[in-house]
């Protein structure tokens, strides 16, 4: 399946983060759709352990936007944020009398996508100009 090329979007991907997916989703649901600056404030104040790796990913995505695409951080918005389950690390905990109990350490993959809102305004202006020219051609033929 071919991926659709999107303009004005930058992402950061964190794989095999040692945390269960539902715990990470609890934080991700709070930041989805918010601006970059508002997200930084929210993540700094939330009391969850998942905030630290998510904050690193948001900063990494913003650095990608600044360096690779020359976007302004003030116009960035978190357009997509998703958490997928990763592999589960399985270990054995030794117990008394030669027994052992299994320990499962869940991991997750987090993807943060930032979108530049100034690009959307430019795109709307561009397509509105295109549409007007198209309508003029139709009117002249009639």
UniProtKB/Swiss-Prot annotation:
One of its GO terms (biological process) is translation. InterPro entries: Ribosomal_uL22, Ribosomal_uL22_bac/chlpt-type, Ribosomal_uL22_bac/org-type, Ribosomal_uL22_CS, Ribosomal_uL22_sf. This is Large ribosomal subunit protein uL22c. This protein binds specifically to 23S rRNA. The keyword Plastid applies. Part of the 50S ribosomal subunit. Pfam families: Ribosomal_L22. Belongs to the universal ribosomal protein uL22 family. The keyword Ribonucleoprotein applies. The lineage of its organism: Eukaryota, Viridiplantae, Streptophyta, Embryophyta, Tracheophyta. It comes from the Eukaryota. GO terms for molecular function: rRNA binding; structural constituent of ribosome. It comes from Oenothera parviflora.
